[in-house]
Amino acid sequence: MSVAIRKRSWEEHVTHWMGQPFNSDDRNTACHHGLVADSLQASMEKDATLNVDRKEKCVSLPDCCHGSELRDFPGRPMGHLSKDVDENDSHEGEDQFLSLEASTETLVHVSDEDNNADLCLTDDKQVLNTQGQKTSGQHMIQGAGSLEKALPIIQSNQVSSNSWGIAGETELALVKESGERKVTDSISKSLELCNEISLSEIKDAPKVNAVDTLNVKDIAPEKQLLNSAVIAQQRRKPDPPKDENERSTCNVVQNEFLDTPCTNRGLPLLKTDFGSCLLQPPSCPNGMSAENGLEKSGFSQHQNKSPPKVKAEDGMQCLQLKETLATQEPTDNQVRLRKRKEIREDRDRARLDSMVLLIMKLDQLDQDIENALSTSSSPSGTPTNLRRHVPDLESGSESGADTISVNQTRVNLSSDTESTDLPSSTPVANSGTKPKTTAIQGISEKEKAEIEAKEACDWLRATGFPQYAQLYEDFLFPIDISLVKREHDFLDRDAIEALCRRLNTLNKCAVMKLEISPHRKRSDDSDEDEPCAISGKWTFQRDSKRWSRLEEFDVFSPKQDLVPGSPDDSHPKDGPSPGGTLMDLSERQEVSSVRSLSSTGSLPSHAPPSEDAATPRTNSVISVCSSSNLAGNDDSFGSLPSPKELSSFSFSMKGHEKTAKSKTRSLLKRMESLKLKSSHHSKHKAPSKLGLIISGPILQEGMDEEKLKQLNCVEISALNGNRINVPMVRKRSVSNSTQTSSSSSQSETSSAVSTPSPVTRTRSLSACNKRVGMYLEGFDPFNQSTFNNVVEQNFKNRESYPEDTVFYIPEDHKPGTFPKALTNGSFSPSGNNGSVNWRTGSFHGPGHISLRRENSSDSPKELKRRNSSSSMSSRLSIYDNVPGSILYSSSGDLADLENEDIFPELDDILYHVKGMQRIVNQWSEKFSDEGDSDSALDSVSPCPSSPKQIHLDVDNDRTTPSDLDSTGNSLNEPEEPSEIPERRDSGVGASLTRSNRHRLRWHSFQSSHRPSLNSVSLQINCQSVAQMNLLQKYSLLKLTALLEKYTPSNKHGFSWAVPKFMKRIKVPDYKDRSVFGVPLTVNVQRTGQPLPQSIQQAMRYLRNHCLDQVGLFRKSGVKSRIQALRQMNEGAIDCVNYEGQSAYDVADMLKQYFRDLPEPLMTNKLSETFLQIYQYVPKDQRLQAIKAAIMLLPDENREVLQTLLYFLSDVTAAVKENQMTPTNLAVCLAPSLFHLNTLKRENSSPRVMQRKQSLGKPDQKDLNENLAATQGLAHMIAECKKLFQVPEEMSRCRNSYTEQELKPLTLEALGHLGNDDSADYQHFLQDCVDGLFKEVKEKFKGWVSYSTSEQAELSYKKVSEGPPLRLWRSVIEVPAVPEEILKRLLKEQHLWDVDLLDSKVIEILDSQTEIYQYVQNSMAPHPARDYVVLRTWRTNLPKGACALLLTSVDHDRAPVVGVRVNVLLSRYLIEPCGPGKSKLTYMCRVDLRGHMPEWYTKSFGHLCAAEVVKIRDSFSNQNTETKDTKSR
């Protein structure tokens, strides 16, 4: 068997056809292709000389012999005809079309054993030719799937009795001899459109010498066909004849396009298969011709089976048609291309013929392209031909990502059918992403491709890459993957690969010109449009709602000149290299950077220049202030032009440089002035509204002592006379040199640092970089300024107290016990001076403001705080688990007296007391044993065990160190309060589920799981809302990378989205439930905490009394008693007395609570992900994966999971008594937490599938899931301390993460928010008052109402500035006058705030303004929330109204006693609305830390409504009590 091949010169393969347009004589030149080889030699010898001139004029086949018009050859039909498909990637004019052509001049033997190439030419000689046309007014070939147009009507006189049809792969298409001439004429007419067709030539095809191929390199063109034909005929003679069946059967050959790697020059690869024939049109005046794919390379038998690779770009689809040609006895085996006589008439007829099949094929290719994008890659050994890649201006080649695989469909010519349905073939190409297992039936391939692109864009937004999704929607793809990798060099390899897979998909879809609808948020109550990018090199322009680059890479050639004009004016004549595709990405975007002032958009230096005209590019001349938080910034543009508008602009570099520099100077000058104004403070806190901040000098890594001496460097601490070594401190700050200036300045912490208590004096050197018993929000362990403050403060403390202090023990002191009081020579225990009470653990100093914690012994009616203005003494604990920051009071004397060196001889005193050393050593050993079995084997307590740790025996009640709260008070509080206040609400509606006045205080659980100082800033619950948003996106990226790497392709979908709250058509009503079966979100909306109070009390009961019960959670309880406990919980809600209950009953009830949740604790969407992590991910990668999965959980689920895991870790700590290891606990609790093997409930999520009943052997899937759940829960219990920390990789995100902390501002910084240098905080407060009354005057226009179960009005308003937080407003009517309500808000917060722990006035600024600090409790073991606010009130407002305004402020005298909350805005407006009634309007926008934006959207508004209800109820309860008292 033979294949027709014609040799081409090297120049024809690598150059475009640049010939001039042909004259009218050229249009009458035709190409004649012989199709039978027997009499080929004579005809060639006859006509070779006669048709030389004609051959030179031929455009379609430049080197062919046109005189070889073979009409009457009785020879045998040729066995195989080679087919090649080509396309034109460079559209330089309006008259460019797509054509499929093939030449059949040269015959080269191919093995008959290859069944994939068995195509014979029948008597009817049916040949398929497809031609496309693209007119200037209408783009017919626009993209994959964009050609869904009506098919032209096929004229009967053109088709005659023969019609295009479809046959099976092995069917025989029989055409009678009588229709042969008609078919030939019709085909000839359809081929006369070549002057409208242009195709690019094959470029740089490697020459492969395969078996039985003839090397015809040196043969003259005139003798080429003659020599090839003679050799081919000689080789065909010994071929064994085929049997009748084989000769009468046509084997369908499918040429499939597969993804194969591109070369480093970005040229797509093409491999040509054998077995079909496409006739060459006679002439192609306006373009290049498509030659045979085998002209330059021969293929062996195994090579014939490998499908080819074709690059489709700019909407032009490579069409390769599978031709099933029936084989009969040879009769007249020729097809003749006749010369044109009436070209214009024939052209019109040919258009109809060609467009019919073209549209049919393109419609089918829409489906094939999608299939090709979701299948595996081709074999590595596939030989390929290189094709020229010439994208348009908006496209660029990308290494490994700029090829589109197109599946070839099967087309058969039939004489008895007119069907136009084209079956789709199986996809075999790889898109770079793992596909889903099953394809959706009924969806076209185009729609699938668009869905895949849409999912890729959604994934990019969900994982912190919204800038690339925007670029794709702006038609600025393809982009260079290498630059993206360089831009995100802080990511690990797996994350980069996951990102590149999506970008590769979008690159291919961009080449196919697939369009997706612009991104739209899901609903009006969604905050999806909140900008968040992992990379710090991109910034979001809020005014234009677009992303722009903050830094430009040096990837553009400075030598390239800029040519003004539209990108449509001209196109590059040569394909750009892979490195030059980001020019559109950065130049067409509004690039904003002070570093890119003189950068110009250009092609890469290694990209070949255009031959005709330089490529028009727009330089990056628009410098936009990228700080999105600068209010009223004059340096930012109000609106930016679109990329297309921007591309047509022309700029002058000199003018641009001058403008940008002036803007940069003004911006830097403003920032510097703001920094200098706050520099006189003890800490240089940069306002959160600023962008770039220049930090102070930082000691760089590698700066040795010799270098310091040469530079004359002197230790700052030495200048102050400090006696503590600082090299250790400097060593901690080395990593700070890798931080950017922005992050280093933003991470500077408060000067209100704490110091160890006197008991921990011996650990001063090793713990100089620690803080005792405190949560330091925003603490940066890499910051050097923190430790300098510690050093300076310690120096002041030592200087403030004499060295020869003598302490006196009371006369009635009993040896072996702690003294009741200690005094020294300068303090008298009976005077007004300070004293230490060892029994109560307090120190009383004279004349200091009080800051005391609400003890559990205080009854609810004894919540009266001492007024800070009238308190004469400060009660401060000196136990070593006290937050050292509490020791800083509002005046400086007490802080100086109570630092670590107040009692320097305390250790000696304790040592010399009779029997004290022995008892202390015994306590130390005993506590060490308890510490080994405590909840945290790797305890991160800020105060590790030491011989000096206090262990009290008071009133025969055993008080362990873990039962001491942060003030040292005993926390063995009674299980139930001595008096439970009676419910005073209405008893209907939402009041049934409203929390009582009692709120659980579980300080021992909080203190025992308090993180260490080094890990405080890494705790999730200390992160701001912007950091949480960024952390969630990074976690999704990390989880996607790990799952795609290790899990099978059918175990996860293409798209990973951040879990959202599921929207059901019918929302279940939980009004009749209070505990069991109530979602965690509803609990948060009702009480502010995700776990009901009664469930928390059950956990505390088990932890305090039942840890020694053998088989806890394993042994079953009594069902009747469990049911009674359930009913007790449903009725009492908050106060359930578990005293005397069986530990196993309570444990079983706790398991039932988690089992009865509407969805698993891990949520329906992520439960399977948790199981997959422990099924497929390697053990060393599981911790990263599980941390990422936890970050994707909703906030309430994550908080409950943390509480439960910490509680279970305490259970396993007592393993010697209860014999419950983490694995044993996991076996008992995993089915309840993951909802394994449970039937679908009525109110469960649609994802929960009904399990099959276990009739015999359990399902293998269930076994695998149970095993994974057990292993996973055991692992999470053991590693619970590490699961809820920020990944270390986030510290490598440079300023993109640290700059999102958004700390409160100082008073000076608040005054400068209005860009007035002379303004102070009073101007800021006045602006706040004016803004409040502006809202009132406008009647709160623009607020959106929000439904709530509380008896209050609730609405919200979106705020474009600052973090992604809404401004909430709740309104209620209160039975009190405005003055009383204002007093209740200012002085009586404990009457309505059930979570209040502490309150204190830090500083009084004027009669109506003060700095106020208060602490609120959180669900254990989560830390308390610390508020430091600047609050001011107004009483002289019109119509008797009052107002209270609060804003967080950074104050150096406010101790950090919890997670510092950032109150962005808090307003109370009280207006009289009747006799004895007032209308209370509460507006709030607060960052509580540790919550996602979704939590604030779904839950925070309900908390605001609940707050005003509690304020109203405080007056209602007071009135009711007053009436009860009068009635008695």
Curated annotation (Swiss-Prot):
Species the sequence originates in: Homo sapiens (Human)
InterPro entries: Rho_GTPase_activation_prot, RhoGAP_dom, SAM, SAM/pointed_sf, START-like_dom_sf, START_lipid-bd_dom
Pfam family, one: START
Site (described: Arginine finger): 1114
GO cellular component: caveola; cortical actin cytoskeleton; cytoplasm; cytosol; endoplasmic reticulum; focal adhesion; intracellular membrane-bounded organelle; membrane raft
Domain SAM: 448-515
Subunit structure: Interacts with EF1A1, facilitates EF1A1 distribution to the membrane periphery and ruffles upon growth factor stimulation and suppresses cell migration. Interacts with tensin TNS1 (via N-terminus); the interaction is decreased by phosphorylation of TNS1. Interacts with TNS3 and PTEN; in resting cells, interacts with TNS3 (via C2 tensin-type domain) but, following growth factor stimulation, TNS3 and PTEN are phosphorylated which leads to weakened interaction with TNS3 and enhanced interaction with PTEN.
Gene name as annotated: DLC1
Name this polypeptide is given: Rho GTPase-activating protein 7
Gene3D superfamilies according to UniProt: 1.10.287.2070, 3.30.530.20, Rho GTPase activation protein
Listed GO biological process terms: actin cytoskeleton organization; focal adhesion assembly; forebrain development; heart morphogenesis; hindbrain morphogenesis; intracellular signal transduction; negative regulation of cell migration; negative regulation of cell population proliferation
